[in-house]
Amino acid sequence: MAVYLLAVAILFCIQGWPSGTVQGQAMSFMEVYERSVCQTREMLVSILDEYPSEVAHLFRPSCVTVLRCGGCCTDESLTCTATGKRSVGREIMRVDPRKGTSKIEVMQFTEHTECECRPRSTVNNGKRKKNPKEGEPRAKFPLV
């Protein structure tokens, strides 16, 4: 048994731990960079966040995995934005607690297919932000 554990430890030292790094060493800059860039990645989304009008039902599971844009851009003035989308189906159990019934059905979710870093000033939930007119204050605060 001790020989087996020693062999496994040596193998991990040579090949790296499952996380992709040798124990005690930092992840390389290139690996950190590649994992953090703006790209589609698997994310959990709440079914009720996607279907807010469905509050009368319970869903199992209560969230699903879909590809969504996420990650860092090279400049703080940019944000990772979806430039391509598609609809995907997921089998979900819908429970009606009032009737005591349940059924499995396919629900549609938006999945991102392409991402791009875009200026924050033009992205606001898919709508362009209104720029203040010249001479107009940027923010209006109530007088106290």
Curated annotation (Swiss-Prot):
Compartment annotation: Secreted
Biased composition (Basic and acidic residues): 132-144
Gene3D superfamilies linked: Cystine-knot cytokines (2.10.90.10)
Annotated S-S bridges: 38-80, 69-115, 73-117
Record-linked SUPFAM superfamilies: Cystine-knot cytokines (SSF57501)
Function text: Snake venom VEGFs that may contribute to venom dispersion and prey subjugation by inducing vascular permeability and hypotension. This protein induces an increase in capillary permeability after intradermal injection, as well as a drastic hypotensive effect after intravenous injection. The hypotension is mediated by nitric oxide (NO), which is produced by VEGF-activated endothelium NO synthase. Also induces angiogenesis in vitro. Like other crotalid VEGFs, this protein interacts with VEGF receptor-1 (FLT1) with a high affinity, whereas it binds to VEGF receptor-2 (KDR) with a low affinity.
Protein name: Snake venom vascular endothelial growth factor toxin cratrin
Organism: Crotalus atrox (Western diamondback rattlesnake)
